[in-house]
Amino acid sequence: AMEGKVWLIKMTVDELVVYQNNHIISNVIPVGNRMEVRVVSDDKPAADAISTPPTLEDAYLYEFNSDWRTA
């Protein structure tokens, strides 16, 4: 089940560049001078991360990356 595995985090572009190296990013939406980033993660990835309902794309990315990590 994907509930509790998708998070919204607001961050700068510079933070996103570093963040995407270690996390599964499913979507990025510009909001002013920051980015609203959807992160797929088993654990809360940041103190200010907000849990959000998963989409089909989130589930696909989670499963694809899970298979890749265990290959």
Residue ranges with predicted function:
Residues 31-71:
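C-terminal coupling/interaction segments
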Residues 1-39:
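ABC transporter nucleotide-binding domain
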